[in-house]
């Protein structure tokens, strides 16, 4: 997939070389500059930005050019539900200042938490073998990297986290959300709450069967095209 998609060429050198060194200090990168250019380009409606890792590039773009706040919608997978005892999670904890900026700056945000939300998107080797293996080069690739994640597949399932964001874009009914006041990410990586803050959308669950059904049907259609 990477070899056949020109946009990925040189990707390792395009992204930020470090996390935000301090709150309010961006990291210049080709990725951040590219996002700014795309956001400010003429179009109807907002640009949907889907970071599925730490928020460094998006936060840097916002700090470098705050005008993009009015031109984008961020759909971010990271952290935990706003009522969870801890906000800490891999994507969020890598760059806390960048994560905090997403919730503080007022950018339109669809927050997809990991625990008990994206976490529902589990599949198994038998299901992948039945519905991905043999469905063209992409299906075989997905099956092989899934099986290669670990050697012991007994009583095992794995979360496919990243498809939660695209699922919301495809059909928001698959990833229900509600409006809530943007939480405050504390220095201890917990959530604090203030009802005077702006609103964000928080996802509350994922319709696992609908999302995987859509994925598997599209793999089959692509393979037979």
Question: What function would you assign to each model-found segment?
Answer:
Residues 17-125, 207:
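Active-site histidine-anchored catalytic micro-motif
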């Amino acid at each position: 997939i990477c070899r056949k998609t020109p946009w990925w060429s040189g990707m390792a050198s395009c992204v930020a070389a470090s996390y935000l060194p301090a709150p309010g200090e961006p990291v210049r990168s080709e990725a951040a500059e590219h996002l700014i250019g795309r956001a400010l380009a003429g179009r109807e409606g907002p640009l949907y930005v889907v970071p599925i890792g730490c928020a460094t590039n998006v936060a840097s773009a916002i700090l470098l050019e705050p005008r993009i706040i009015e031109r984008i919608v961020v759909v971010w997978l990271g952290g935990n539900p706003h009522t969870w005892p801890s906000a800490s999670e891999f994507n969020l904890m890598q760059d806390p200042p960048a994560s905090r900026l997403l919730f503080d700056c007022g950018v339109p945000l669809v927050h997809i938490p990991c625990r008990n939300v994206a976490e529902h998107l589990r599949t198994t080797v038998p299901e992948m073998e039945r519905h991905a293996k043999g469905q063209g080069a992409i299906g075989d690739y997905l099956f092989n990297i899934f099986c290669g994640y670990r050697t012991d597949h007994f009583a095992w399932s794995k979360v496919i986290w990243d498809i939660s964001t695209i699922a919301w874009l495809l059909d928001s009914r698959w990833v229900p959300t509600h409006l809530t006041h943007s939480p405050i990410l504390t220095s201890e990586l917990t959530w604090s709450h203030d009802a005077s803050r702006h609103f964000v959308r928080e996802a509350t669950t994922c319709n696992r069967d609908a999302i995987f059904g859509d994925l598997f049907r599209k793999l089959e259609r692509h393979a037979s095209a």
